Amino acid sequence: MKVKEEDKSLWCSSLGLNIRSLRQATNVREQLCSLTEKHHIPVVTDPSLSSMERKRNIKRCLCQGFFMQSAIYDRDGFYLTAKEAQRARIHPSSSVTTPCHWVIYNELVETSGSFIRTVTQVEGKWLAETAPDYFYLTSFPEGRMKQELIHLYQELLL
């Protein structure tokens, strides 16, 4: 049975889901499935992992590809992008509605202000472990981001 586009949009809205992001996720999934088939890579799911562990693993994988597009919560609903320290808000179309300490994002857009889109909450330590050369302290100017990284590295050493 084919579902009307309008019905899909209404269903997503009723659940607080972003239809654009779901389409993008479906497209990425189809591409990954196609690549695994093409290269004869078996797709294995560990049945012993809980749903929470699988989500964590997916987020850690996303950190591998998006560490350069990370940001930390600043204040008043704004985030600071990692290297540029540009202040931006989470785009209103995002399903992330509560402040998260660290996030990764797919794009930074300039409209009536600066917004980050396709946002995922992550842990700072995942970013530091994934890309230690990128998050090397001497490459950051003095400021909020550097202070957060110092605090993060101190926690990792404990």
Task: Please provide the spans of the model-predicted regions.
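Second RecA-like catalytic domain
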Residues: 1-154
